[in-house]
């Protein structure tokens, strides 16, 4: 309920906020498509083609820029971009994560430099965290703050050394329903 009210603060009632949230989830998961299975197959094929193209390019780094963001992430040699699909033990294709809109890879954990500001809230362990700003140097978080939930965010990041480095980076097209 708290998340529904956060996403739809102008809903007339708690029930309407929850209904609106479910409606968005169903749209994002392509449930309303005439043939949802076909829609997901086509979408997965597009994501796979993007991952294949990125794998051929083998960029050395990604540079993210936006208001409040200027972050360069180094990519390891021979990195692999993945997309939506996976193969189970029986050799059958499936989508383990829905909705999925991104292609993703693992960055070089030693090569993250700059800062990023979150444009969306984060829900962690029952806490809503907003206005997150993270600064990286040589792959490690050196500063982090949040307008709301600052201490929760700091505790999350500084509870172990591994939490201070990035383990994944993703590319999501701007018109995506989750961007």
Kindly give the residue locations of the regions a language model identified:
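Long, well-ordered mid-to-C-terminal structural blocks that present hydrophobic/aromatic surfaces
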Residues: 103-155
């Amino acid at each position: 309920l708290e998340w529904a009210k956060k996403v739809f603060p102008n809903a007339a009632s708690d029930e309407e906020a929850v209904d609106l949230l479910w409606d968005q989830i169903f749209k994002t998961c392509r449930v309303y498509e005439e043939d949802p299975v076909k829609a997901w197959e086509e979408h997965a094929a597009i994501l796979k083609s993007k991952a294949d193209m990125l794998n051929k390019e083998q960029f050395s780094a990604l540079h993210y820029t936006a208001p409040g963001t200027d972050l360069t992430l180094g990519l390891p040699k021979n990195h692999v971009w993945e997309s939506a699909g996976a193969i189970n033990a029986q050799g059958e294709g499936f989508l383990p994560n829905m909705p999925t809109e991104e292609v993703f890879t693992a960055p070089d954990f030693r090569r993250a430099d700059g800062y990023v500001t979150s444009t969306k809230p984060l829900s962690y362990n029952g806490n809503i965290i907003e206005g997150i700003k993270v600064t990286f140097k040589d792959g490690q978080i050196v500063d982090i703050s949040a307008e709301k939930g600052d201490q929760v965010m700091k505790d999350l990041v500084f509870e172990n050394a591994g939490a201070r480095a990035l383990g994944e980076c993703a590319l999501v097209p701007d018109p995506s329903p989750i961007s």
